[in-house]
Amino acid sequence: MATNTMLCLFVISVVLALAFATNKKGDEEPENHSTGIFGKVGRVVTVALAMSSRLGGADATRGGGAVYGGNLKSNQLPNNNWMAPPPPMAIRSAKVYDSKHSPAEYLKKFAQDFRRKTGMHSQRHHEETTLEQEKRVAGAGPDPIHH
């Protein structure tokens, strides 16, 4: 049944293609310069094949087409290389908020951990030392100015 339908659609598409392709230049309709005889034939054949369902003729949806048909042995390839999908990966859920710590403490801890892992330093590391920090630094001996 599907082959008869496909043959009928093919014959109709060829007849329509020949009808469109045999237009004379003296006809009243304007000529489209972008498509010649092959453009017209290709357009009609494409429409006719698209109407005859995808890849398998009229019976493709019922299982009788070229893709799903039981009588075509060339489409039935052995599936020896089939692999099962990988097992699902265990996702480590990150705790965004722990009840023991406040969000500010958690953020501070996260920043310290991030700096430790990546080797980055805080912004204070790059700042100049203040006068109080310089006074706190113990020298090698007594301060010669005051002693």
UniProtKB/Swiss-Prot annotation:
Question: Is Repeat there in the keyword field?
Answer: no
> For this UniProt entry, which segments traverse the membrane?
none
> Tissue-wise, where is it found?
Highly expressed exclusively within the dorsal esophageal gland cell during syncytium formation in host plants.
What's a single GO BP term from this record? cell differentiation
Here the segments flagged for biased composition (Basic and acidic residues) are 125-137
Show where the record puts the motif CLE.
136-147
Signal sequence residues: 1-21
Question: Which stretches does the entry tag as region Required for secretion from the host cytoplasm to the host apoplasm?
Answer: 21-83
Identify the GO cellular component terms for this protein: extracellular region; host cell cytoplasm; host extracellular space
**According to the record, which residues are glycosylated?**
N32
Disordered as annotated region, ranges: 57-86, 116-147
* Keywords carried by this UniProt record: Apoplast, Differentiation, Glycoprotein, Host cytoplasm, Secreted, Signal
| Lineage: superkingdom | Eukaryota
Q: What does this protein do?
A: Mimics host plant CLE extracellular signal peptides that regulate cell fate. May play a role in the differentiation or division of feeding cells (syncytia) induced in plant roots during infection.
What name does the UniProt record give this protein? Answer: CLAVATA3/ESR (CLE)-related protein 4C
> Which species does this protein come from?
Globodera rostochiensis (Golden nematode worm)
